[in-house]
Amino acid sequence: MTERTLVLIKPDGIERQLIGEIISRIERKGLTIAALQLRTVSAELASQHYAEHEGKPFFGSLLEFITSGPVVAAIVEGTRAIAAVRQLAGGTDPVQAAAPGTIRGDFALETQFNLVHGSDSAESAQREIALWFPGA
């Protein structure tokens, strides 16, 4: 089943010049980049994107991090795109949960600075795409 998902390459991925590597892995998986933009994230967009984490102890530092530098936002399409992107990304904790061969397993060292975000469900993907790409 063809799906759409949101992928973010976070500020640490931009700073470490991993955009090409990450996009290449997505494309080699057979997925399509339907839209792509480099942007600065406002506090408002960050709060909306991470709304489910509001009130948690790490919420403030999460917003500070995602707004600390440019982000690449992409709409990725393809068969089972949501699961495929999450498999490529690897576990949220790059040391304990991300397998070698995944983006996080190969390149990340900390849970917060884990390089990429991928929507976790069809509902999340729809909501997140509407936030980052209004009208898409």
Swiss-Prot record:
It catalyses: a 2'-deoxyribonucleoside 5'-diphosphate + ATP = a 2'-deoxyribonucleoside 5'-triphosphate + ADP; a ribonucleoside 5'-diphosphate + ATP = a ribonucleoside 5'-triphosphate + ADP. GO terms for cellular component: cytosol; extracellular region; plasma membrane. Pfam families: NDK. GO terms for molecular function: ATP binding; metal ion binding; nuclease activity; nucleoside diphosphate kinase activity; phosphoprotein phosphatase activity. Major role in the synthesis of nucleoside triphosphates other than ATP. The ATP gamma phosphate is transferred to the NDP beta phosphate via a ping-pong mechanism, using a phosphorylated active-site intermediate. NCBIfam families: PRK00668.1. This is Nucleoside diphosphate kinase. It comes from Mycobacterium tuberculosis (strain ATCC 25618 / H37Rv).
